[in-house]
Amino acid sequence: MKFLLLFMTLVFAAPSSAADKILFVLTSHNKMGSLDMKTGFWLGELTHPYYVLADAGFRVDVASIDGGMAPIDPKSLDFSDENNARFINDKKLMASIINTKAIEDVNSEDYQAVVYAGGHGTMWDFSNNELINKLTVSIYERGGIVSAICHGPAALTDVKLSNGQYLVKGRKLAAFTNEEESNVGLTEVVPFSLQDTLMSKGAKHIYGAAWTVNVVNDRRVITGQNPQSARKVGKEILTELKGIK
């Protein structure tokens, strides 16, 4: 009898399968438009929030648009950054990037939060992506968290909720700015202006000075303006997840 009571206590006290799982989604695109230049995801926009969340005990999976090895933007390989340096010796995370899940194979019900890491590659394969749209809506409408960093909000440009409205409509968010795109000389290279496109869908674009930390949390949509904002995004997700749990 005591064994039965203990068993039932453990079963009913166990959290749901999604309660402590977070999904990071990376780009699979590695070419910078018409330029002879490689791109991909920005390493720090994965490592900074990843370690905040993993160190807090959350289970983290990594997916990409096509699956397999996700391309890292060569310009983001700064190993003087402590989180990037940690990544070099992190066999688990390294393996996750080498062999990402394809987004079509992801079960959205497994996750309490999704994080769209940035990098210029996202401008080619995150926007107008039906698989991303379905994943985002599923997690958000179950009460989960949607997050995106820098160019990662390209994933949010076409997401419509079940009521037919854009997720970003009337919502405050941060994203890579036109000024920052101009600073890196890629305004005419990227396929669209992220800032202008989000605003055209009704988003209230909240921006800080170029290359400074700026994170916005509006009703479980957590966004960061640039690579400098990545760690704070992780902390904001952590705070929000603790509130949900």
Say what each PLM segment does.
Residues 150:
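Catalytic, metal-anchored helix/loop core of enzyme active sites in primary metabolism
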Residues 1-4:
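Positively charged n-region of N-terminal signal peptides that target proteins for export
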Residues 13-15:
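N-terminal signal peptide c-region/cleavage motif recognized by signal peptidases
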Residues 19-142, 146, 154-245:
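Extended, subdomain-level signal for the structured scaffold at the beginning of enzyme domains
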